[in-house]
Amino acid sequence: MNIKHRVILSVSMVVLLILIGGPSGAGRQTQPDLVLVAAERSHTEVITSSQQSFSITAPADTPLENASIQLEVVAGEAVNPHLRSSGAVDCSSLKSVVADVVTPGMNSEEKALALWRFVMDACYHGRWGTSLDGLEHLNVYGYGYCGTYAAVLESLWWTAGLTARHVNIGNHAATEVYYDNSWHYIDADTRAFYLLKDNRTIASLEELNDNPELWTMLRRGSSRKAGKKQYYMTMHPNGHGRSPVYTNDFSMAKGDVMTLGWQSRGKWCLNRGEEGGKEPAWEPPYYGNGLFRFHRDFANPSQSRSGLVSSTNIDWQDGEAGYLHPQKAKQEASLVYRVKTPYFMPEATLSGRFLRKGTSDSLELDISTDNGKRWVTIWRAEGTGSVKGSAVTTQTQQVTTNVPWKYSYLMRLRMRAGKSSRDVGAYNLESASVLAYNLRCLPALRQGANRITFSDEAKASRTVKVTYSWRDDLPVRLSNDTPMEGEQVSVSVRVANRGAAEAVNVPVFLYFGNPSQGGVEIGRETIARIPAGGSGLATFSWKATRKIAGKAVNPGAQLYAVVNPDNRVPESDETNNSFSRTVKVLNPPDVRIPSESFIRFESVKERPQSLAIVATVRNLSNSAAHGLFLDDQAAGESVVVTVYDGNPAKGGKEIGRETIPKLLPLEYRNVSVQWDIAQIKGAHTVYVQIHPPVNLTRALGVKTSSTMAVPIDLDAYRRCKGK
């Protein structure tokens, strides 16, 4: 066969291979590529001043998922860098929390309740205590029990200018706040406060002890017995409890990067606190993990002194070497740096690039978590030449809330030159510390316009890059992004085809929970065709729930969409076929009059022939079993309250009505309707009817009204009034 024929045959074989899709995946380039992806967004701002603001605008009509915040020091040193977002409460200090939560014109009770509500939205009940410093608990942990809740709430009350106290009432730390010349018991851990019989005044612990029947919000069947309080404790008025004082001050120098992510990576604090015992703590249901990268490049020694605690026998003047080395041979040289962050550090990786010319030269990396009293060696150089060293340690678990140098550790490099001082040295030194923190206190973005403010206390010039990353235009969309438990919602899954060929009969599955971990299938649909470069939509009906086997899933319902799970449709990339999204499913509002004792008859001074019927209506939606936070409960919207003389089902006459625009979880309102009794005598039964909130009816269909009836003898009322 001549060359010409061999060439023609070769070309023909190539064409044939392309047409039949082989070999080595050549045909995959002409296949579809089915993907479930969101739009990945980011915004980077370069900061050069001590205070600088910028705007980030996210779509207002589509859900947004925060991904990460990154601070990178490009030049100089940032001292106590701080970010504030208009979309979140600023938790950098107790004062900033109060400034964001308390609004002008609030009275003392409104301030106390607003801060109480904030604490229940920022923290959740855990199985053990954490910090007794309010600011630390907010930022670092966010979970705990009564004592830690008290540390946060009482500190915030003091900061707001209120007087507060922490009361031990027997295996429970309670909080009271003082205003209007009396104490008032308001508890964030148990999510409760109780009203006196006037249905207006929040009771104190003394008053509850005197009237044990008030110990339930319903005032029905309380088995509580009056008891003595064991002792009183008052948190320090500057906002700190018994824990060593927490500070979120820290510095970052050139090369340092802090990344705060919205995902948990399986790294948390194993310490249970003072009362939790010695066993390792279970994984909290809700927390975030980030990373702090501490980096010192010794090519320019003059820029490597930030964070330096001490140096011994180090030649800082030899700039020509390109690395740091001992000043004198045969003597140990050392560098000690402090790594400090505002957050708990479950583990750290210490690393660097070093020089070790011979076996007589030595290099070691040590860590100290007790401020230099004790050192643990975690790495020794074994090779020679240019050596890369790295070691992972969980020694940082010891730097907890109980030590005054929280959250920091010392990193030490020790080296010794056997012959010449230049025979051993360090080109760079680095640590990567995993961070654990309360996600609810990060400066997050919200839908729509966001204003971000960076500030620090650096006196010299510095350049910092701030990058926000988030996802929007999610491929899994709901007809209602915050449905109520039991609400029927439509879920649409958008499948894009980024390949070069059309896809037909594309199967799409939707699960509640991760299908690889026992997730429950919601449904399956088939998209008839998705053209190359186009997209298709699969629509499902889902009865919203966050419960699996009767138990609520936190922090919300995980919806998993999977396209082409069995690879029935040949495609070029099978690694991008799933997407998950967390949906906050709300516990429906429970709006009612707790009991008959919450309906009172009061005289009207300016209208002696009228009687005021005052009904206390409360949203009792408060199931800690449904969700971690109070905002997992739904508000009641447009609640109509109608008062009747007689049973409305049997022709009772309407006296009047009032609409409550909104009732937040645990909020109450006193509805007052005036009844003209000038021509009415004798015994009557007043019925107060609570119509279901409009948003409840819209979500779950028509619901029956709740009715409470109380008798009144108008003749007896007049006789008492005459006295």
Write out the residue ranges for each language-model feature:
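Conserved Ser/Thr-centered positions that define the repeating blades of beta-propeller domains
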Residues: D366-D370
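Exposed low-complexity, polar/acidic, P/S/T/G-rich flexible segments that act as propeptides
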Residues: Y407, R416-R471
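Hydrophobic/aromatic-rich core segments of domains that either
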Residues: A151-K225
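Short beta-strands within extracellular/lumenal beta-sheet-rich domains
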Residues: G319-E347, T394-T396
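Extracellular/luminal regions of secreted and cell-surface proteins that mediate adhesion/ECM remodeling
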Residues: R471-K723
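A short beta-strand element within beta-rich, extracytoplasmic domains
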Residues: Y343-K357, V491-V493
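Secondary-structure boundary elements
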Residues: F54-Y141
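Alpha-helical and coiled-coil interaction segments, frequently adjacent to or embedded
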Residues: V35-A38, L196, R200-L308
